[in-house]
């Protein structure tokens, strides 16, 4: 049996307004499917698409738990509630640590991702986020399997006045040094 789509109903659309969203940074006039902003846990489980957990309803959480849909790929960006809320422009974004705790209690593993945006979620906020996520790796059940740190990608098609700063080579080196130092520290304690 072949199915037209992997999902039998429509894709769950993203209701966040992240200033760094790659969908919003594409040129106009391309095929419609390139402009679909999914935030669908089913696509995360099936294909490794990243989701934010802000768009899930009670039934979605229940299904993730009941069907043990694991691992999921989660866009974290910051564990600091105010910073994550600022980045996703969504009040529900501040609940990320409670949501990861719920995933842990339900034996769901994740791969985490942090998109580093200069002067927003770097420095001490980045360090706190990495260490917060590492706590979920140190336990007997490793909820957080990996944490990817990626630089914000900006195109010439992005909306004006998005408040983002492009990453220079020097800044990238500084972030790499910071993350490698944290990584070395965690490798000794995990």
What are the residue ranges of the model-derived segments?
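Conserved Radical SAM active-site core
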Residues: 1-142, 153-174, 178-182
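Short helix-terminating capping/connector loops at secondary-structure junctions
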Residues: 139-144, 188-190
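Positively charged, polyanion-binding regions of nucleic-acid-associated proteins
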Residues: 150
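Membrane-inserting hydrophobic helices used for pore formation or membrane fusion
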Residues: 176, 185, 189-190
């Amino acid at each position: 049996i072949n199915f037209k789509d992997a999902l039998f109903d429509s894709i769950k659309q993203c209701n966040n307004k992240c200033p760094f969203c790659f969908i919003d940074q594409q040129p106009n006039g391309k095929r419609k499917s390139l402009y679909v902003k999914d935030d669908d846990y089913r696509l995360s489980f099936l294909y490794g698409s990243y989701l934010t957990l802000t768009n899930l309803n009670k039934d979605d959480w229940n299904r993730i738990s009941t069907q043990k849909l694991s691992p999921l790929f989660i866009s974290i960006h910051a564990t600091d509630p105010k910073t994550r809320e600022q980045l996703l422009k969504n009040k529900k974004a501040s609940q990320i640590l409670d949501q990861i705790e719920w995933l842990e209690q339900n034996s769901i593993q994740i791969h985490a991702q942090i998109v580093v945006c200069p002067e927003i979620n770097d420095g001490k906020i980045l360090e706190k986020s990495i260490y917060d996520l590492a706590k979920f790796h140190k336990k007997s059940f490793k909820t957080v399997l990996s944490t990817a740190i990626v630089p914000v990608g900006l195109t010439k098609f992005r909306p004006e006045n998005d408040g983002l700063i492009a990453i220079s080579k020097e800044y990238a080196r500084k972030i790499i040094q910071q993350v490698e130092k944290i990584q070395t520290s965690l490798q000794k304690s995990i």
